[in-house]
Amino acid sequence: MTRGAWRCIIGWLICIGGTPVASVAQAPETAVVMLGTGTPNADPDRSGPAVAVVRAGRSYLVDAGPGVMRRASAAAALHADSSLQPRNLRILFLTHLHSDHTVGLPDLILSAWTLERDVPLEVYGPPGTQAMVDHLLAAYAADIRNRIDGLEPANPTGYQVRVHEIAPGKVFEDGNVTVTAFAVPHGDWEVAFGYRFQSADRSIVVSGDTRASDAVVRACDGCDLLVHEVYSAERFQTRPPAWQAYHAKAHTSTTELADIARRAAPKQLLLYHQLFWGTTDEGLIAETRAAGYKGPMRSAADLTRY
C-alpha cells in the first residue's frame, strides 16, 4: 500500500472520531474497539453489532453479529492488538438473542478453534443461550468430528463452549475487569441486557438494543464511555407505520438519547447500531445536539478504537 493510501486511511479514522494505530499508545489502558456497528440492514461498510473491550492483553466481546471474526482480525492488525487475534477470542457477552447479534456466534465458536484457540469459549447471555449453543454444535457435528478424527491437526477443546445463563447483577470478574449486567427493555424480548465494564482505569457501558431506559442512566452514572444504540428521530416519519410501532418500542431515538445521555452524564457518548434511514453520522449528532445534549459525542464506525 502506498504512503498516500495510508495517509487517507489514518485521516478517515481521525475524522470519524476513532484512534489510528499510531495513536494507540496515548489511549487509556482499557479501550473499546468497534468490531461492528451495523444493524440488520446489509450495509457493506458496517458489520453486525460487536463491541470489544480490551485491556492488559485480554479481549471481552459484547455480541457476535455477522462478520465478527473478520472484523476482529482486521482490528488486531490495524491496532497491533494481539488480544483480538482469533485464538485469543475467548469471552463473549450476549445482550439478547436477535439474529443480527448472534449470527457470528458459530463463526466465533468454530473459526477461532480452527485458528488455534485451544480453550472453550465462555459465553454469558440470557436464558435461551444454552439451547442456541447446543443447536449450533449439533448443526456442525459432522464438521467437528471430521476435523478431530481426520488429518487436520485440530485440538479437542477449542470448539467447546461453556455457557453461563445470567441474571442482572455482577456476572464476571477476573482481576482485569468486572462486568455487571443490567436489564433493558427491547421490543418483545422478555430478557435483554446492557453491560457495564469496570477496570482500574475506566468504566464503560454498552447499552445493547433498548428503548429509552432509566436502567442505562443508572448503569452509567458518570461513566467514562457510554456506547448507545440510536435511530434518527427526523427520519422516523419516513418509515412505514408498522415499523414505526416496532422501533418506538424497541429502540432509542436521537431525541430520547439526548435526555438519557444528559442524565447519565458520561464523559463521552458513542453512538452505534445507528439506524440512519437516509441521514448521516453528522446528522445523528446534529439531531442529538438539537434535542439538548451538549456533552462530548461521536458516531462510531467499524474498526475504530476509543
Range-by-range predicted roles:
Residues 194, 201-203, 211-304:
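Cap/insert and terminal regions of metallo-dependent hydrolase folds
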Residues 25-205, 216, 283-306:
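Binuclear metal-dependent hydrolase catalytic cores
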Residues 7-20:
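Bacterial N-terminal signal peptides
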Residues 1-5:
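N-terminal secretory signal peptides that target proteins for export/translocation
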